[in-house]
Amino acid sequence: MISHYAVHVKNTSLKSTRDKYLKILAKQNKIKGGIPDISNNPNDSESIPNKLKALWETANYAAMMENMDTSIGMVLDQLNSLGLEENTYVFFSSDNGGGSNNAPLQGGKAKMWEAGLRVPMIVAGPGVPENSQCDQPVAQWDYLPTFHALAGSKASLPNDLDGISIKSALEKGNAGKLPSRDSGFVFHFPAHYTVPITAYRKGDFKLMRHLNTGEIKLFNVAKDMSESKDLSNTMPEKVKEMTQKLDAYLGKVGAWSMKEVYETRENELNRWIEIRKQRIIEFKEQLKAKDIENNMRNHLKSQLIKATDEIVRYNKIKDQLAKDRLSDKWF
């Protein structure tokens, strides 16, 4: 398994590739003097106009894409040189949707809208027809049983796996018959740092529930991938059916509620605050010593300031957490 930081961490492109795109964009936008490379000095970006920052982001994104493409090409070339291409399956995918524009899909990374959940999956290997396409929804937890089937393993798998083998879909596309997926696709995301939503897909329909308010949305994502037409008011029976199945699954696996998440986060912040308060007491006691060296005195003073600042920061986070608990935003 190869896990690329591109396109993820901002400064992971090669300088030579990044410079190439900085020059291209500078020429296209008629930027005299070129676009500065701020990757090694992010603090300098404060003095750079927003337009140049945006162009740098574009150049860096393009460079990361090219570097990733080159890296994957090197892996494929090595497989070919070793004569393994006819006996190897290559899966290419992503852990979540993109963090920027994902039109026509809504949302993106860390969101339960389709742009956060739908990712590319490209597969090459024995029995997979070239240039074929399959529209059957699958999930990455299907990989284990799929690899098991592709390898022809006789070893038994646990009975409680969430995933299914998608071998038939890889080989026959939409004509492939997949095993029954009783639980559907459940994406339970009771997060305190973003919009808390549970998404549940069963067949063509996707139900979304806001975990602060309980508000429900329903979409036919097979026909409406942009999730522009909420069907919850016109299909109450479908909402009831899917809600019951979703709640049964969440209860079965012991899924956390938002109340538990918020309380855990608040307790964590309170614990950090108490630790800093205790440190402040200790630092002040140490500073009372008359024989303390100047270097140590300065160090303790800086640590005292740091602990005080951290208490202020954690209290601000608590204030924001209290506001987030009342938020009804979907994005």
Label each region the model flagged:
Residues 161, 168-177:
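Acidic, glycine-rich loop-and-strand cores that form catalytic or ligand-binding grooves
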Residues 196-209, 217:
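Short, surface-exposed beta-strand/loop micro-motifs that present aromatic residues
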Residues 4-6, 190-192, 264-268:
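Glycine-rich beta-alpha junction loops
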Residues 140, 162-164, 183, 193:
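Conserved glycosyltransferase catalytic-site signature
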Residues 49, 143, 212-215, 221, ...:
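Long, internal low-complexity/basic segments
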Residues 181-188:
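WW-domain-binding short linear motifs
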Residues 1-144, 148-161, 199, 209-212, ...:
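Active-site-proximal cap/lid insertion segments
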